[in-house]
Amino acid sequence: MVSENLMTVVMLPLLALMTIAGYYVLIPCEIREQNSRITPRRFIIGFWPFVVSASFVYLLVQSQATIIKFFDIKINSHYTSLIMMIEGDMVAHFQSFATPLLTYFNGFVYLIIFSFIMIFTFLILIFTRNVTALEEFNIAFIIIYLTAFPFYIFFPVTVTGHVLPGVSTLLYNLSPIIDQGVRVVDPFLDNGFPSLHAALSVMAMLIVMFRTNLTRYKAFIVISTIAILFSTIYLGIHWITDLVAGTILALISYYIAVKYRRTILNQPNRILVSIEKKMSIMDQIFCEKCSKQVSIIPHSTHIECPHCGSIQNYHPLTYI
């Protein structure tokens, strides 16, 4: 338990510092100034549904060991053998040039850079008021986790470093703190197919590349995603098949999120509005046409002005 907590204690402050640095380096100055006009209350009202929904799915997936134990699910290891039949020991070549420095660097990429781009992409979409992309990111994130979850329970694939001769689990060997920390989210070290590192990083890259105009961050996330994919193989964790499956899952999730965003969000938005009504959560805005103050339920998306009858679209994160 101490090791698990220590890994979190080390990572969180570092990720916080990187996020602050990224905010000033990767977000244009004019957007930072615009963001300062959002009131804390409106900011919280706007982003809490995204955090709650993504966190719920994440925690569900992390309950893997509990679910397996509760339902007495028998883990079958022959799926790892199937992957070995498909690709052999190709991944072993990636450790033929291993050095301590390269191992530490890839460990940093796998643990820190991956976590950073997931957190920062979410935050940067909020800061840039790109609600459409934020909704697509959230939908794709949930689809990826819910799709991967059954595979991790019923079709486990063990990390390459535990089954291939000549391949070491370089990441876990760096420190028992890392080994214990990783087992919190992957208790049996067999959450291989599909690769979440591949699926989530590629999905985030697609959102940033095609749904934003953040030039500097586009360059950063492309390089980071390539490095993440390489690190998963080099460190003795994933098979190439895992990465291919993860990439395909990212593409499908991105497509569904972009094409069917409005349809998917119809029912959740109704639930949000219902909750806000019951809790009497209201926001005060000014009509764009008559400039009179109007009360609106935050996630109702639009309102008809009672004074002039005009229709005005609204979201807490985009209204100034």
State where each predicted segment sits.
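Terminal transmembrane helix and immediately flanking juxtamembrane interfaces
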Residues: M1-T160, V167-G181, N213-I223, A227, ...
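Short amphipathic alpha-helical segments at helix-loop
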Residues: Y104, D186-F188, T232
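Alpha-helical transmembrane segments of helical membrane proteins, especially in multi-pass transport
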Residues: P156, D179, D186-F210
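Short, glycine/acidic-rich beta->alpha junctions
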Residues: L200, L235-G236
